[in-house]
């Protein structure tokens, strides 16, 4: 055995395989069970419990966020409809007031026209009355003049 | 002869010598068990301290242990897959922790100050018995994982994608433990030897960069061992379509 001689050991050497091997294997298997119950299980429980807690919280937060978004959208549509409703009411009122204004204007115009017409008629009648009277007085005067002229002769 | 003087120098480093324990008629490498007990004891104390008072709001050691757990879970999950990684995580994690603690313990603690009647203390992973034990456990694990998950369909893996692969796949079953054990053993032993020789030749300053390199190698080897073990298990439980 080269290795034995090269390193000058009287017994054993680097590649001396003996009962250390199976005993070490048993020791490692035992260590696996010990570490499993002492380390992997308890730490795993804590870590996984926390991971579950965190992921649950995240899911809950996501649900809440989506709910909030839904409510927000709801509110937005409500706001939108309220706005259009308000616009409709305003325009309706505007139309109505416009109509009322026009009606009132027409009424006032008519009235004014009517009174103007009446005044005109009155003026006309008065004018003609005055003219009649004037022509009558002119007639009287001319008759008087004529009479006087005739009498003086 | 020059070679002879070199050999005696190497002998001064006590390479390939062991502290033998004789129980009945079986012989053990005592130094491997001594260091592994000390290091694993420290590991278990560390872990017990960290998990003594587990809180939802981690503090101090618990933080570190949770980071470690997360690291091992990621390693197992990426190599083995979402479906069965849970079953194998403790094994992969134990391999990682055992190799890591052994490598770093061997590199960081000045074992040489403790004199043994024969051999010297060092990284348990610098002993071929330890690495072969780990590698064989990995082999058993991936066979068990494949058979328990897929039953006899596990052997489809050997003729996948074509039956031409059969001899290579069978050969792989031997090369996997061989490469696993010798890679770890060789790297850690080489690191110890390089540091030992350098300290022997130039006791000041010069060994320090090599020691840092050794720490780096030690950590990388632990990661490689655990990753490959997880990869082999993942390969065995993978479903072919």
Curated annotation (Swiss-Prot), chain B:
<feature type="transmembrane region" description="Helical">
    <location>
        <begin position="128"/>
        <end position="148"/>
    </location>
</feature>
<dbReference type="GO" id="GO:0031676">
    <property type="term" value="C:plasma membrane-derived thylakoid membrane"/>
</dbReference>
<dbReference type="InterPro" id="IPR035908">
    <property type="entry name" value="F0_ATP_A_sf"/>
</dbReference>
<keyword id="KW-0066">ATP synthesis</keyword>
<feature type="transmembrane region" description="Helical">
    <location>
        <begin position="214"/>
        <end position="234"/>
    </location>
</feature>
<feature type="transmembrane region" description="Helical">
    <location>
        <begin position="193"/>
        <end position="213"/>
    </location>
</feature>
<dbReference type="Pfam" id="PF00119">
    <property type="entry name" value="ATP-synt_A"/>
</dbReference>
<keyword id="KW-0793">Thylakoid</keyword>
<keyword id="KW-0138">CF(0)</keyword>
<protein>
    <recommendedName>
        <fullName>ATP synthase subunit a</fullName>
    </recommendedName>
</protein>
<dbReference type="InterPro" id="IPR000568">
    <property type="entry name" value="ATP_synth_F0_asu"/>
</dbReference>
<feature type="transmembrane region" description="Helical">
    <location>
        <begin position="30"/>
        <end position="50"/>
    </location>
</feature>
<comment type="function">
    <text>Key component of the proton channel; it plays a direct role in the translocation of protons across the membrane.</text>
</comment>
<comment type="subunit">
    <text>F-type ATPases have 2 components, CF(1) - the catalytic core - and CF(0) - the membrane proton channel. CF(1) has five subunits: alpha(3), beta(3), gamma(1), delta(1), epsilon(1). CF(0) has four main subunits: a, b, b' and c.</text>
</comment>
<dbReference type="GO" id="GO:0045259">
    <property type="term" value="C:proton-transporting ATP synthase complex"/>
</dbReference>
<dbReference type="GO" id="GO:0046933">
    <property type="term" value="F:proton-transporting ATP synthase activity, rotational mechanism"/>
</dbReference>
<dbReference type="InterPro" id="IPR023011">
    <property type="entry name" value="ATP_synth_F0_asu_AS"/>
</dbReference>
<keyword id="KW-0472">Membrane</keyword>
<keyword id="KW-0813">Transport</keyword>
<keyword id="KW-1133">Transmembrane helix</keyword>
<comment type="similarity">
    <text>Belongs to the ATPase A chain family.</text>
</comment>
<keyword id="KW-0406">Ion transport</keyword>
<dbReference type="InterPro" id="IPR045082">
    <property type="entry name" value="ATP_syn_F0_a_bact/chloroplast"/>
</dbReference>
<keyword id="KW-0812">Transmembrane</keyword>
<keyword id="KW-0375">Hydrogen ion transport</keyword>
<feature type="transmembrane region" description="Helical">
    <location>
        <begin position="91"/>
        <end position="111"/>
    </location>
</feature>
């Amino acid at each position: 055995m080269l290795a034995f001689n090269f390193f000058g050991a009287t017994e054993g050497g680097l590649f001396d395989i003996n009962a250390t091997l199976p005993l070490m294997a048993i020791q490692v298997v035992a260590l696996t069970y010990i570490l499993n119950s002492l380390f992997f299980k308890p730490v795993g429980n804590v870590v996984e419990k926390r991971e579950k807690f965190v992921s649950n919280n995240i899911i809950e937060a996501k649900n809440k966020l989506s709910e909030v978004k839904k409510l927000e959208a709801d509110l937005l549509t409500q706001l939108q409809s309220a706005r259009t409703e308000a616009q409709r009411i305003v325009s309706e009122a505007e139309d109505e007031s416009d109509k009322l204004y026009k009606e009132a204007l027409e009424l006032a115009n008519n009235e004014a026209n009517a009174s103007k017409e009446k005044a005109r008629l009155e003026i006309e009648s008065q004018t003609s009355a005055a003219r009649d009277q004037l022509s009558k007085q002119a007639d009287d005067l001319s008759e008087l003049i004529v009479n006087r002229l005739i009498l003086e002769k | 002869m020059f070679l002879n003087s070199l050999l005696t120098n190497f002998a001064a480093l006590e390479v390939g010598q062991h502290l033998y324990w004789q129980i009945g008629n079986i012989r053990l490498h005592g130094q491997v068990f001594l260091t592994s007990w000390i290091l694993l004891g420290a590991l278990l104390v560390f872990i017990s301290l960290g998990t003594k008072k587990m809180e939802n709001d981690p503090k101090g050691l618990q933080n570190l242990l949770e980071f470690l757990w997360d690291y091992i879970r990621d390693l197992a999950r990426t190599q083995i897959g979402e479906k069965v990684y849970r079953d194998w995580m403790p094994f992969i994690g134990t391999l990682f922790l055992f190799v890591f603690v052994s490598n770093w313990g061997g590199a960081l603690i000045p074992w040489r100050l403790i004199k043994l009647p024969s051999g010297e203390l060092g990284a348990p992973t610098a002993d071929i018995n330890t690495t072969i034990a780990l590698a064989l456990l990995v082999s058993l694990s991936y066979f068990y994982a494949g058979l328990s998950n897929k039953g006899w369909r596990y052997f489809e893996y050997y003729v996948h994608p074509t039956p031409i692969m059969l001899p290579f796949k069978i050969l792989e079953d031997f090369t996997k433990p061989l490469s696993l054990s010798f890679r770890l053993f060789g790297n850690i032993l080489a690191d110890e030897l390089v540091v030992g020789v350098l300290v022997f030749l130039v006791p000041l300053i010069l060994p320090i960069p090599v020691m840092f390199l050794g720490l780096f190698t030690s950590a990388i080897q632990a990661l490689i061992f655990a990753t490959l073990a997880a990869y082999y298990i993942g390969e065995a439980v993978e479903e072919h379509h």
